[in-house]
Every structure is written in C-alpha cells, then in structure tokens.
A protein has these predicted regions:
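Structural beta-alpha unit
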Residues: 1, 24, 74-108, 145-158
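Small/aliphatic-rich secondary-structure junction motif
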Residues: 3-52, 133, 146, 156-158
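Short, well-ordered secondary-structure micro-motifs
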Residues: 18, 45-48, 97-98, 121-122, ...
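General small-molecule cofactor/ligand-binding pocket signal
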Residues: 34-36, 84-88, 139
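Short, hinge-like loop/turn segments at secondary-structure boundaries
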Residues: 50-54, 102-103, 126-127, 155-158
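A short acidic, glycine-rich active-site loop
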Residues: 53-68
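Glycine-rich, Arg-bearing micro-motifs that act as flexible, cationic patches
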Residues: 107-132, 147-150
C-alpha cells in the first residue's frame, strides 16, 4: 500500500514515537523511509548587523544539532528498511510541504506537539499545518500525555 514514507523528525519525544510507527509501517509494507528535519536559517539581514558572527555560530550549532538528530534517527532504522535522510535549511512548515510535493511520498508520519485543543487552535502547529495542506495522507502520532496534559484534558472534557 505504501511505497515511500516521509517522517518528520526534530528530536522530540513525539517525533521519536512517530519514527517508531513509521519504521513498523515501512517494515510491514516493504516501503522506503525518508527522514526529514529542518533547521530555520536567520533572515539574511541579520548577518549584516553587529553580533553577526555570534549569530553565525548559533546557526552552525543548530545545523550540527539537527544533523545529529537525523543521524541518531537513521541509526534506529533496521537494515531491512531502505532509508534516506534530508536536512532542509528553512522553517519546518515550508520544508515539509516542499518535500511532500517534490518527493514521491504516499504517506507523511509526524508527531503531534501534544497541545490541548484550545492551545492548538490559537497557536497552530507544524503538524496541524501539514495535515491541512498536504496532498498525501498524514499520520499524526500523539505522544504520551504527562500529568499536566491529562489534567488539562480532564478539565476540558468537563
């Protein structure tokens, strides 16, 4: 059913859970995995300001951390699953939507930020954005709720 699964990874617990589900799906379906992570780049004008070298150092550190996240995720994929990694230097929302449109993906798997319904509606999220703008099916994997989130959900339910 699925041939090429795109997985959004960012090092969060929710993304890690999404990766586990994507690996299981890819293994069962004999599908390829594409692991995508994005690191936003500061606007070009920021480099023309005082302190630009410190900003450049932070930008490089963010890139290295993102590449480490991708390597760690790739190492978790069994050899029986074909995997490709992509690191995009841009914000997560456009990076994911571009990869979806440019790649031959038939499923996107990503973690939820685990926000309550009201917070998600007010703040938005990458998963919400991709869910509503993707041309392919999107599987949102919810993370485990902590005690605060459970209390919030119970309060919202009345």
């Amino acid at each position: 059913m699925f041939r090429n699964i795109l997985v959004a990874i960012d090092g969060s617990r929710d993304a890690d859970r999404a990766l586990v589900h994507a690996i299981d799906l890819a293994d069962c379906e004999h599908a390829k995995l594409t692991l995508l992570s994005a690191v936003p780049s500061p606007p070009a004008f920021a480099y023309a300001t005082p302190g630009a070298s410190a900003l450049s150092d932070l930008d490089e550190k963010a890139r290295q951390e993102t590449e480490a996240i991708v390597r760690t995720a790739r190492d978790r994929v069994p050899q029986s699953v074909s995997v490709t990694t992509v690191v995009k230097i841009e914000a997560a929302k456009p990076a994911l939507l571009k990869q979806i449109s440019e790649g031959d993906h038939d499923l996107v798997v990503m973690g939820s930020r685990g926000r309550g319904a009201v917070r998600s509606a007010l703040l938005g999220s990458v998963s919400h954005h991709v869910l509503h703008h993707s041309d392919v099916p999107v599987l949102i994997v919810r993370g485990e709720r902590d005690e605060g989130q459970q209390a919030e959900a119970a309060h919202a339910a009345g």
